[in-house]
UniProtKB/Swiss-Prot annotation:
Major location (coarse): secreted
Organismal lineage: Eukaryota, Metazoa, Ecdysozoa, Arthropoda, Chelicerata
GO CC terms, sorted: extracellular region
Descriptive protein name: Tachystatin-B1
The species this protein was found in: Tachypleus tridentatus (Japanese horseshoe crab)
Keyword annotations: Antibiotic, Antimicrobial, Disulfide bond, Fungicide, Knottin, Secreted
InterPro entries: Tachystatin_B (IPR020957)
Length: 42
C-alpha cells in the first residue's frame, strides 16, 4: 500500500489517489483525465 504517488507514476486527475507532496498530476493532453505525476514549479 502506497499512500501517495511518486514522480512518473500514472495518475488520474480527478482521483483520490494523489501524487506526493510537491508533485501534481500533469495531464497527458488538455482535457485528459489521465496523466503522470510531475514536480510542481513553485
Amino acid at each position: 500500500y502506497v499512500s501517495c504517488l511518486f514522480r512518473g507514476a500514472r495518475c488520474r486527475v480527478y482521483s483520490g489517489r494523489s501524487c506526493c507532496f510537491g508533485y501534481y498530476c500533469r495531464r497527458d493532453f488538455p482535457g485528459s483525465i489521465f496523466g503522470t505525476c510531475s514536480r510542481r514549479n513553485f
